[in-house]
Amino acid sequence: MTLLPDPQHPLEEAEAEAAFAAILDGAVADEAIARFLVGLSDRGENASEIAGAARAMRARMIPIKAPANAIDVCGTGGDGHHTLNVSTAVSLVVAACGVPVAKHGNRAASSKAGAADTLEALGLNLDRAAETAEETLADLGICFLFAARHHPSMGRIMPIRKALGRRTIFNLMGPLANPANVRRQLVGIARPAYVPIYAEAILRLGTDHSFVISGDEGLDELSLAGGNELAEVRDGEISMRRVTPADAGLPESAVTAIRGGDAAHNARALRALLEGEHGPYRNAVLFNAAAALIIAGEAQDWHEGVEEAAEAIDKGLANALLNCWIAALE
């Protein structure tokens, strides 16, 4: 079995790529993987480690063809807030605005319901979603890239992640290994201090336009509770700024106002949102959708993004898209 480097010492990008290549290829014992992941997490992963690990994951994924302007909206998870599925709802709303969305996601690793769990509860056939991803992306402007299907090397890692029950570098790697090789991303991470580090990892890997976001309370999406850290990665540069709900013309609300439950609960909430229900969940989706629309070049500012997203919901476009998507995969 391959010996992993000491996680207490920072790794260069090539070292990290080699270590995770060994892990993903099954050349490392489970106990050693668990110790390595915990060691990295306790020390704090750096940009070169995140980028190197993502490169190893990319090299082993099953890719799909996608439009050059396709976008992904996802969070790293592991924030412990167990909110409703904001990025999943945002993906539907943004796609309904005409932006191709290659939604990359998985079942829950440390929460009650991940994107895959909730979409399945809504009636989406996950197996068919994986088999027809290119087709549905071309025909409907949205697809779900089920990580379990596109990253077969991750199969033996999931039990380790489940057993650890905590955030690891795999939360950080996932969004950077989208099988559609998207060049535009909205990525939420659970630790505000990590925003510039994660942005540097994205810069190393290459992007056309991406936002890395984190709510001050450690939410892996733009939060309505107050301030948010935002790093914009574009034209080979990183720019940092603060963003609040007021910037988008939205009211503040506590994180607990969008607390989720199991997959069935979250699916009902998402469906109610798309059917026009107002409240904090809708506002959270509008806030994050506005960010995605700015990245996609469909909105010039936060207010315009919120207006476009609200229109996609209120005209029933996002709900109709979900229905068409479910029907197409039956």
UniProtKB/Swiss-Prot annotation:
Quaternary structure and partners: Homodimer.
Its taxonomic path starts at: Bacteria, Pseudomonadati, Pseudomonadota, Alphaproteobacteria, Sphingomonadales
Gene3D superfamilies in UniProt: Nucleoside phosphorylase/phosphoribosyltransferase catalytic domain, Transferase, Pyrimidine Nucleoside Phosphorylase, Chain C
Entry-linked HAMAP family:
TrpD (MF_00211)
Cofactor binding, note field = Binds 2 magnesium ions per monomer.
- Please give the Gene Ontology molecular function terms for this protein: anthranilate phosphoribosyltransferase activity; magnesium ion binding
Provide the residue positions that the database annotates as binding 5-phospho-alpha-D-ribose 1-diphosphate: 75, 78-79, 83, 85-88, 103-111, 115
Question: What EC number(s) does this enzyme carry?
Answer: 2.4.2.18
What organism is recorded for this protein?
Novosphingobium aromaticivorans (strain ATCC 700278 / DSM 12444 / CCUG 56034 / CIP 105152 / NBRC 16084 / F199)
Record's catalysed reaction(s): N-(5-phospho-beta-D-ribosyl)anthranilate + diphosphate = 5-phospho-alpha-D-ribose 1-diphosphate + anthranilate
The identity of this protein, by name, is Anthranilate phosphoribosyltransferase
Instruction: Tell me the function of this protein.
Output: Catalyzes the transfer of the phosphoribosyl group of 5-phosphorylribose-1-pyrophosphate (PRPP) to anthranilate to yield N-(5'-phosphoribosyl)-anthranilate (PRA).
GO biological process entries: L-tryptophan biosynthetic process
Is Zinc found in the keyword set?
A: no
- Where along this sequence does the record place binding of Mg(2+) 2? D220, E221
Residues binding anthranilate 2: R161
